[in-house]
Amino acid sequence: MKKISLFVLCAVLPISGWAADGAKLDLNVRRIGLEWSKTDVKNADKYADSPVSALNADSQDFIKGIFDTALQYKKNRFQWDNALFMEYGETKLKPDDEPETVSENADDILLSTDLSYACWEFSGFKLGPTVRGAYDTEFKAAGDAPRQNILRSNAGISLFDNAIIKSLYLTGVYEYDFTYAGEQTSKLAAELGWRLEYQVREGVKLSTNGYYREYLSYSEYVPTDLERDLSAVVRLDTNLWGDLTMGPYIQYRRARARGVDVYGSNFVMGISFNYITSFGLIK
């Protein structure tokens, strides 16, 4: 938690110093909610030692909690997003005359800061360079695998701040992975990521976000390191009352590790109940 607190403090203090310059500062609650889901996992036995919980989970029903917020600062051509994403899902099974079993289906904490600059503006689009830093970890270890710990930096080009295309980027990636004690590795990759929103009609919004990451080189050989990683979410949110929404969603994760010759996948579909809003802190 000390790492998370330090990251948040470093992100917020510079923003507070610039706020007096007439810039815009918003706290976007992308969603805080619960998801009921049915999960179908393939080749989980091949990924039993992977630190990625989504690839070694059990196929079953579960309930998951989501917390996704972003502090967004805009001034002239600059946009600076500081985001915190957390999710956790766990199912407890207790068959008759058998001990209780616990299966972790989702576990992720992602702290990120993203700075983009609009070199060109046209037809409601902004295009320019983007840089990003992130710390990716978990609440606890998945089974016998260690708790994931990754520092990640991105640099590339981004299309952003559009009514539909909130973010669409192509970047190079550097990762420092210290998940395994004594086996710290550095990795280079290419990443395509997106966050899109479409207002179907009043009170109904379709949204999707995700990424595809292709790893290109590694400093060390670790069998559980991923070669390819795809993650995508699609949601349809319908307003129930005020800022409370409900709707179906689909989530898909597909990846392949260096030491495995088949892909692991995690397909989730279910119903999502969310609180979504935005607070204008500085206008």
Feature locations, PLM:
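Short loop/turn motifs that connect adjacent beta-strands in outer-membrane beta-barrel proteins
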Residues: A20-D26, Q72-D81, A118-G128, F160-Y169, ...
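Transmembrane beta-strands of outer-membrane beta-barrel pores
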Residues: R31-K42, K75, M86-K92, G133-F139, ...
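Hydrophobic h-region of N-terminal signal peptides that target proteins for export
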Residues: C10-W18
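Surface-exposed strand-loop-strand hairpins of Gram-negative outer-membrane beta-barrel proteins
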Residues: E35-K64, K94-T101
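Outer-membrane beta-barrel transmembrane domain signature
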Residues: S167, T171-N239
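Predominantly the C-terminal beta-signal and adjacent terminal strand-loop region
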Residues: D225-K283
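Hydrophobic, lipid-facing positions within transmembrane beta-strands of outer-membrane proteins
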Residues: I63-T69, I109-T113, N149-A155, L188-W194, ...
